[in-house]
Amino acid sequence: EDQKFGVSLLPAGADAGKLGVLDDLTDVTPAGSNARLGEHASEVHAQRELQYDIKYPYDLSHEKVSEGDRKLAEAMTMVADGPALAVLKDIYRRQDVLELVGVHSHIGSNIHDADAFIQAAKRMMLLRKTFYATDAYTLPEVDLGGGYSVAYTDGEDSMDIDVELGRLADAVSTVNRALGMPAPVISFEPGRWTVAPTGVTLYRVGTVKPVELSGEAKDKSGNPVTERVYVSVDGGMSDNIRPALYGSDYTARLANRKGSEQTKLCRVVGMHCESGDIVVNEVRLPADIKRGDILAVPVTGAYGRTMASNYNQALIPAVVGVGEAGAHVMIRRQTIDDLLSWDVSE
């Protein structure tokens, strides 16, 4: 449904005169006359711009963050009698209240295979051509979405946006020339790529506990290990659910002092008393790490605080902005009073 956070998003967007991105077939039905989005736009007596979101069958990101379920996407193939084209036609017929300005594609999250974006873009151009051939209308805009990868650990690479977006633009131009179509206005959404590296989460170390491992234990590089040090911190899955939910990996650094040159294999764990409450699965930290130290976990600017919760009644930490002019609190730390303010006593 179109209810989120207690707000009916479709009429709210129409009231604000915003460009709408339609990503749910229930918002506009192929039947046409009862299209809910059209009804909302009619209520405010104004024409609203709309993009239609297309899903693709790419298994490139974690299954829980993929935007394109393979079976669903195959059912929405870009052919003349496909549901995607049918919905576009239905929206186009409602030009009195809905101005169809383009299509939107989003194939997943943190994708390292740059060629997948090119394949999705080519399909979008073919859909655009098919729509033009049947309705003589050139969709002027195509949003090719986001999902560009960033490096979370030392062994990963961030996608080179300058290079890959250049390749993507060239591919779009080439396909449109071959199709005899004018190039659309192209937009991209490098949200994670932009925001993730700007965030660092600071944790205070609690218990530090070495645990002997079996003779067959190995680290992620395949080297035999006999001991792992469990480093507990004052946070965890309440402030960063991604490791527990997606198996996401991070790294960590000792932030408050220079530690010993000797390191030990460590696993940084949260405070929620669950085996899945892992902050960093494997990292080498100074051997003298101790209670009270501060650990910095980088690349938490995206999908960190925005996915934070009060799980186990944990309080959501503050956000501090740091720049050349100094540091200032951007979002204050949550308090017990904040948490209890939701309770209703009668």
Give, region by region, the residue ranges found by the protein language model.
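Short acidic, glycine/serine/threonine-rich loops at helix termini
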Residues: F5-G6, E67-R70, D113-F117, Y152-D157, ...
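Glycine-rich and small/hydrophobic secondary-structure elements
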Residues: M159-N176
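Charged (often Lys/Glu-rich) extended helix/loop segments that serve as interaction or gating elements
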Residues: S173, R177, M181-E346
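Active-site-proximal beta-alpha core segment in soluble small-molecule metabolic enzymes
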Residues: E1-G20, A31, E39, Y52-K55, ...
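Flexible glycine/acidic-rich beta-alpha junction loops that bind and position SAM and/or redox cofactors
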Residues: G108, P140-E156, S187-T198
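Polybasic, low-complexity intrinsically disordered segments
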Residues: L25-D27, G32-Y56, L60
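Short glycine/threonine-rich loop-to-helix capping motif typified by GTGT followed
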Residues: H112-Q119, A151-E164, V195-T207, V280-L285
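Short beta-strand segments
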Residues: H104-H106, D143-G145, S232-D234, P298
